[in-house]
């Protein structure tokens, strides 16, 4: 029993000693590794020592991601792409023949694309501004033309209105003067008529005989002249002629031109005889024969011609 206990104690001591020895060796190795890691290694870049990827690696990773995200190129674009790669390789070489970092080349390309995009946007903006300015100019021009046209129309309308007003005033003035003259003539005729009516019967008979003789002598009498000659109104002269025709003292016709044509009884008989002899007579034949059968020459003119 004592032997087994002693063996167990010995085994436990051995295990404890082995564990302590193992831990001591591990701590010693770790202490030696830290100073070695802290010291920089010659010929190795700092970024590599720190485990940071190089710029070329970053650019390559970015290019790979862009190629993965980009759509597949067309077959005819494969050759230009290959040529572009060779151009990129040539562009990666600097002026002194040294190869430029891939990241720097990528940044330059990205700047050119962005610059081209910005230039295109600026060009579109300028184009829009130019179109807007042209549109504004057209609007201003059209508005100016409309204003000028309206002004011209207003001027023409004003001129037309003034013209109509002037014509209206002239017409009113002319009518006023005619009315005044008519009133004056009416007053004069009334005075003359009163003086004529106040005469005695002998004077009236003498004037009536002169009236008839005046018509017979002139053959063709303008009614206005007849009225003025005997100080009558034109309507009064017409009424007096119609009364004389009704009682047989005068024979003749009043035409549409305001004239009385005296035709004697002998001339009427000659015209009636001509129509009776010919039977049916046209108006043209009757007019031609009337010129021969009816004498329209005034008595004074005929007497002057005979002398």
From Swiss-Prot:
Organism: Drosophila willistoni (Fruit fly)
PANTHER family, alphabetized: DDRGK DOMAIN-CONTAINING PROTEIN 1
Low complexity biased stretches: 32-43, 54-83
Domain of life: Eukaryota
Membrane topology: Single-pass membrane protein
Topology Lumenal: residue spans: 1-2
Protein name: DDRGK domain-containing protein 1
Segments of this protein annotated with the region Disordered: 32-162
Coiled coil residues, start to end: none
